[in-house]
Amino acid sequence: MRIRTAFAVGFLGLAAWSALRAQKPFKEWPAIEYADFPVPPDYQDKHEWTRARLRYPDIYGYPGRIMFLDDGRPFPGYWTMDYPRSDRHLLEGVRRLTRIDTKSVEQVVTLDESEEVFNWPVLYGVEVGHWNLGDFEAKQLREYLLRGGFFMCDDFHGTEPYHGVREWDTFTRSMSKVFPDREIEDIPDNDPIFHTIYDLQERFQVPGAVYFESGLTYEAGETGKVPHWRCIRDDKGRIMVAICHNMDLGDAWEHSDEPRYLEKWASLAYRIAMNYFTYDLSH
């Protein structure tokens, strides 16, 4: 079993996984929004940490069913939303705002027999209102989390049908396979996760790129208006799953260099991520 190896790093007192010393090779995947995004020149450099992105099967049949985008490219799965621009902008922020020794590129991870997920301490899932975990994937994700892993999920909206999908119900259907015996709860404002680096007692909705077209900060109608910071905890009270519902942090990181996207939204999205990452590495 791979487990964490704790050590102090400056004032943060972070922890790293010994498995990172034998990091898996970096690989790029086709994406919905970006057909060709530049790779940083230092992408092969060795570092202690990076954030992994979950490649999951979805309700439309990916990866088994072949579908096509409007431009004729094969549909690469909802898991690629905002990828890789969002990931690399975020990792630049980790380098600037923390002392975490991070790579400049993300790591895409699949829940499969390779057990690669156990090499990466932080896992991110986007558009989880469309995922569809099988029994094997749910079991491996559960084991990953109970061993000390941290899963942050983002960019799903509302409780009523949105483009024909009840995203909250779809999310919880798969999550209940992962943890049938654990409840989803709201994170209180005084929880340590909101105060590891930045004090984030006061928070607001972080909108996605839909704002550029609609001028709205929410999606999915009335039930998408209120942002929810929720979680699932382990037996010791540690947050294992951080659930960002009715917000789109991924778009905030992705468009943080876009003048039309308000600085206050991008700033909060980065601060939430920095707090969540340092919480995980110190708990």
Enumerate the predicted regions with their spans.
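Extracytoplasmic/secreted envelope proteins and their assembly/folding machinery
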Residues: D87-L91, A138, R142, W168-T172, ...
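Hydrophobic/aromatic-lined pockets within catalytic cores
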Residues: G149, S176-P180, F277, L281
